[in-house]
Amino acid sequence: MSCIKMKDNCRNFSLSKWQDTRKPWLILIIVTIGLTCIAHFLFQEYLFMEPCEQCVYIRFDMLVMAIGGMIALINPTNNIIKIFSYSLAFYGIWLGLEHCLTLNHIHEVVHSENPFAGVDGCREIPIYPFNLPLHEWAPSWFLPIGECGMDTPVVPENAYNHLNAFQKFFIGTPPDFENGLYSNGWYLIPSLKFINMAICCLIAFLCCFIVLFAMFIAYVLDKNKPNAKIFALAIVILVLVLKFIGEPKNPNQNIASLNHLNQVVLRYS
């Protein structure tokens, strides 16, 4: 009976109907907010991994996607709601992919034999889309305090005597902190230095894109929604508008990215 019931459920499942429910959007919210909270509370606050500029941008991108999901929860079947929810979700993914690729490039350059080649983006004061001063509104979340391309734990001296066994397992023991799982930076498999944080975030954004794009196509091709193609075009246009109008403008701030990178390399050399 259970096998027959599973087959019936699979037969009745429709991606178009599913994207009209709150479930996929709730999953999106849980994933994006969950990853952002893990980055802040676990890695930053508990394991002393200081976020760099691209890291805080990725947090912003995740929260943009979450806001899109929250809007969809209002009424996921409403076409106007869909315009804003899909647009914000795709916009956040677009930004996230860009920032992950930039972070991975910086990470590879800093850890290469020639760390001065090809890096041109490492600000101490971030510039968010639409020039939102998020680093002033919530500095503990959106102000970068780490060095570009370096995600090794930076433990303050006043915390040396207060580290528990769990923390020491990941960041090592004082004063050198060389025997922890993440002493050489965060990797999915630290012993092999396999898949760094930037690539893991990139995979997360790609997974979200694949699911959302499949939902979007199912919505467009739904024969029961004759106006879906018009609303889909509006979504594409709004994503482009958000991307190009939202590009941050910084006429007054002096960006010495290469000099900052040089300081990073000297610090860790």
Curated annotation (Swiss-Prot):
It is a multi-pass membrane protein. The chain crosses the membrane at residues 25-47, 62-81, 198-220, 230-247. It comes from the Bacteria. Keywords: Cell inner membrane, Cell membrane, Disulfide bond, Electron transport, Membrane, Oxidoreductase, Redox-active center, Transmembrane, Transmembrane helix, Transport. Disulfide bonds join 52-55, 122-148. One of its GO terms (biological process) is protein folding. Its main location: membrane. One of its GO terms (molecular function) is protein-disulfide reductase activity. It is found in: Cell inner membrane. GO terms for cellular component: plasma membrane. Interacts with DsbL. Belongs to the DsbB family. DsbI subfamily. Required for disulfide bond formation in some proteins. Part of a redox system composed of DsbI and DsbL that mediates formation of an essential disulfide bond in AssT. This is Putative protein-disulfide oxidoreductase DsbI. It comes from Campylobacter jejuni subsp. jejuni serotype O:23/36 (strain 81-176). The gene is dsbI.
